[in-house]
Structures are given as structure tokens and as C-alpha cells.
């Protein structure tokens, strides 16, 4: 296998790294700061990015860092369905038996959220991943979950995570009530050219290899092909290393990188 050819102790360039392996890019640090603020001050947050930019990873690492005695994470990965389906998913995350009608569901969820805050001293954080797929009626339900009569307390924190389409959707007049509530937002960018070099070195070292395996031309070609998007970088790097091992080459050069980019469809 190509891992043993290069002497790796484990497979590098995983799309699901543990927190210790996360690369602290400038963009990642910006997201981290905003999510920490959101956890402390509550409200609504928005994180967007291209496919593979690391949005879901950012949300996962953020929630893993929280004290489970103080926070309850409600994670909804909504790919299709109606507003009623979304509310049912949220109710299930709250360990509720979902009511049959929309109005009853909203009241049911709101009541559970208040009880969590007041009785268990837990603050719920609702994360809507792939939120760009939410239909308009579903998005219109979210402000209702943030209203608690005349009480100004922020009993529920909402984090919307999705592709750039989500920003365009939220710019519509029908979603002004939700848009005005957004207190923190950030668009997650890819790695810069310098960060790409550092990222490659970090991933190799974490897998047990200290010497560089990508020459200058390969690294430049990788940046041009991936624009620094982490998932694309990981895919291309693994493909290039596999092809290099097959060719008995100890390094990835431009020619190997170009073949890898074609195979990885980048």
C-alpha cells in the first residue's frame, strides 16, 4: 500500500481529523472566535463556505469544545422535506414526541427550550447544517422558535451552516426577521498559498513523515487545482501520493500532480 511505501504510521489527509490535527488557518481562527462569542452571548450565527471548505468540521469541533452540563446540542442535517419535517426533527433532538400540527410543535419546542434553561440550567444550541437546502417555509419557522413572548432572554442559540446560496436566500425580504437576528457571521475561505504549504507539512508530520513529499511545482499546482479548499486538497494529496508510490517515486512532482488532478477530477 502507498502508506507503507512512504513510511506513514497512519493515513494522512483525513477529511475527519481530530481536534489536535486541525490546521489553524486564518479563516479557521476567524470562525472559531465568532463561534466562541456566539456560545457566550447566544443569539443567531451564520457560517457559510464552498463545498469542502470545512463548515461542518468547524461546527463539530465547536460543539465538542462545549461543556455538556451547560449546553445541549440540537443537530439537524436537513436535506429535504417540509417545515413540519424540520420542526419534528428539532422536537426529536429535544427528546420530545412530536406533535402533529405545526403550531403545537412550535409551542412544544419552545416550552422544552425554556425548561432546559430554567430547570436544567442548560442552554440549547440548534445547529442547522446544510441550511442552504432549507425551503423558504422551513426557514420562516426559525424566528418563531426564537420568540418567547415578552421575555427578552435568549433561551435558544441558532447556528446556520451552509453554502453561499444560503446568504442569497437570507437576503430575500421574506427572511428579514431571521436575517436581522444574525449577530455573528463569517464566510469560510480556503487556505492561502502559504497556508497550503504549512498544511501539507503538518498533515505529513501528524502521519509520521517529516520530510517533504511534494516538490515546489507540485505544491503550486495543487493550489491552482484546489484553491486551498481543504477537502479538495486532501483528495488530491492522497491521489498524488498513491500515484507516486505506484511509480516508485519518493516525491510528488508536477507530472504526477497533474495526473492526480485528472484522476481526482479537479
Q: What feature does the model see in each segment?
A:
Residues 76-80, 170, 183-196:
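Conserved AAA+ ATPase "SRH/arginine-finger" region at the nucleotide-binding site
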Residues 49, 57, 104-109, 133-141, ...:
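Sensor-1/coupling segment of RecA-like P-loop NTPase cores
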Residues 8-13, 70-73, 81-100:
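Conserved NTP-binding/hydrolysis module of P-loop NTPases
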Residues 3, 82-85, 97-141, 150-154, ...:
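Mid-core helix/loop region of P-loop NTP-binding domains shared across ATPases and GTPases
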Residues 1-41, 266:
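A short, basic N-terminal segment
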Residues 177, 194, 198-266:
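C-terminal alpha-helical "lid" subdomain
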Residues 63-66, 166-181, 190:
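Short regulatory helix/loop adjacent to the ATP-binding pocket of P-loop NTPases
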Residues 41-61:
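Walker A/P-loop nucleotide-binding motif
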Amino acid at each position: 500500500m502507498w502508506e507503507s511505501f512512504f513510511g506513514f504510521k497512519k493515513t494522512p489527509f483525513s477529511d475527519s481529523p481530530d481536534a489536535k490535527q486541525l490546521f489553524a488557518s486564518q479563516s479557521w481562527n476567524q470562525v472559531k472566535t465568532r463561534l466562541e462569542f456566539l456560545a457566550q452571548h447566544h443569539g443567531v450565527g451564520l457560517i457559510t463556505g464552498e463545498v469542502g471548505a470545512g463548515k461542518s468540521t468547524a461546527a463539530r469541533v465547536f460543539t465538542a469544545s462545549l461543556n455538556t452540563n451547560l449546553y445541549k446540542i440540537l443537530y439537524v442535517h436537513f436535506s429535504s422535506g417540509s417545515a413540519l419535517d424540520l420542526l419534528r426533527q428539532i422536537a426529536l433532538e429535544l427528546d420530545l414526541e412530536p406533535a402533529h400540527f405545526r403550531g403545537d410543535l412550535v409551542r412544544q419546542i419552545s416550552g422544552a427550550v425554556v425548561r432546559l434553561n430554567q430547570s436544567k440550567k442548560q442552554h440549547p444550541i440548534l445547529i442547522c447544517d446544510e441550511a442552504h437546502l432549507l425551503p423558504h417555509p422551513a426557514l420562516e419557522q426559525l424566528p418563531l422558535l426564537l420568540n418567547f413572548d415578552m421575555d427578552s432572554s435568549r433561551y435558544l442559540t441558532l447556528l446556520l451552516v451552509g453554502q453561499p446560496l444560503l446568504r442569497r436566500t437570507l437576503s430575500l425580504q421574506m427572511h428579514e426577521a431571521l436575517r436581522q437576528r444574525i449577530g455573528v457571521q463569517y464566510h469560510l475561505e480556503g487556505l492561502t498559498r502559504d497556508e497550503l504549504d504549512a498544511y501539507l507539512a503538518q498533515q505529513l508530520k501528524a502521519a509520521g513523515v517529516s520530510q517533504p513529499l511534494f516538490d515546489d511545482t507540485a505544491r503550486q499546482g495543487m493550489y491552482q487545482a484546489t484553491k486551498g479548499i481543504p477537502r479538495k486538497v486532501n483528495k488530491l494529496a492522497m491521489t498524488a501520493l498513491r500515484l507516486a508510490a505506484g511509480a516508485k517515486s519518493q516525491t510528488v512532482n508536477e507530472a504526477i500532480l497533474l495526473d492526480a488532478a485528472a484522476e481526482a477530477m479537479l
